[in-house]
């Protein structure tokens, strides 16, 4: 568990397209409490174990907000091997501002790889959300030591919702599949996804996948 205070500044400005969130500029300040339990067998691509992470913020200053407000988000992940080369994974997460609406800018976003992959990055946004993800991981080959570790095939199903999001479908969900490599530069994932209401994407990602 960790307790502290975060301080910074936030400035939003439209450069192209139609404005979706307010234009704000100012100080951000929040007391923060973080809880983390990590019982996974690998920090990058786990095959066994579980993780629980929860963050609570009390924002006393945020550009555009009319008063102080709370934010809580929690994520739970579970990994279970079914053979030497294969494993399943499940994750669930959610967050809320507990009814606080005048937060200046939205506090939660969905869309992009691993967060409704068929949707555009941060396409859905609001102050309360949930996301479920379940999938299968299968080891394909091992890389030379100077290149990385292993390469996996990954398939997953994702479903989530952002309450109050503009133009959101009744049930945002998708299927995603691709190849994940644990390289010397970090995990690299390339794949595609097909979802509801004609959403579909090809994508690649360098960085944390789980």
Annotate each language-model stretch with its function.
Residues 1-23:
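Transmembrane beta-barrel wall of Gram-negative outer-membrane proteins
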Residues 1-2, 44, 87-89, 187-189:
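Membrane-spanning beta-strand positions in outer-membrane beta-barrel proteins
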Residues 20-21, 28-151, 163, 209:
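C-terminal outer-membrane beta-barrel translocator/porin domains of Gram-negative envelope proteins
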Residues 32-35, 179-183, 199-210:
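Outer-membrane beta-barrel "beta-signal"
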Residues 193-199:
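A short, acidic, flexible beta-alpha connecting loop/helix-capping segment that sits on the rim
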Residues 163-171:
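Small/polar, glycine/serine/threonine/aspartate-rich low-complexity segments that form flexible
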Residues 1-8, 36, 53-57, 91-95, ...:
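Transmembrane beta-strands of outer-membrane beta-barrel proteins
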């Amino acid at each position: 568990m960790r307790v502290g205070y975060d301080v910074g500044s936030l400035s939003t400005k439209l450069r192209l397209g139609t404005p979706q969130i307010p234009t704000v500029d100012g100080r951000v300040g929040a007391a923060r409490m973080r809880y983390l339990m990590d019982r996974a067998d690998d920090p990058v691509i786990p095959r066994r174990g579980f993780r629980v992470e929860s963050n609570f913020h009390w924002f006393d200053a945020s550009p555009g907000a009319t008063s102080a407000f709370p934010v809580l988000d929690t994520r739970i992940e579970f990994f279970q091997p079914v053979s030497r080369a294969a494993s399943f994974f499940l994750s669930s997460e959610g967050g809320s501002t507990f009814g606080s609406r005048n937060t200046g800018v939205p506090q939660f976003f969905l869309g992009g790889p691993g967060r409704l992959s068929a949707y555009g990055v941060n396409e859905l946004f609001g102050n309360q959300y949930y996301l479920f993800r379940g999938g299968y991981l299968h080891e394909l080959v091992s890389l030379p030591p100077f290149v990385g570790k292993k390469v996996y095939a990954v398939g997953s199903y994702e479903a989530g919702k952002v309450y109050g999001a503009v133009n959101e479908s009744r049930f945002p969900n998708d299927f995603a599949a691709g190849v994940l490599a644990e390289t010397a530069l970090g995990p690299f994932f390339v794949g595609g996804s097909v979802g509801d209401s004609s959403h579909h994407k090809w994508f690649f990602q360098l960085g944390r996948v789980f």
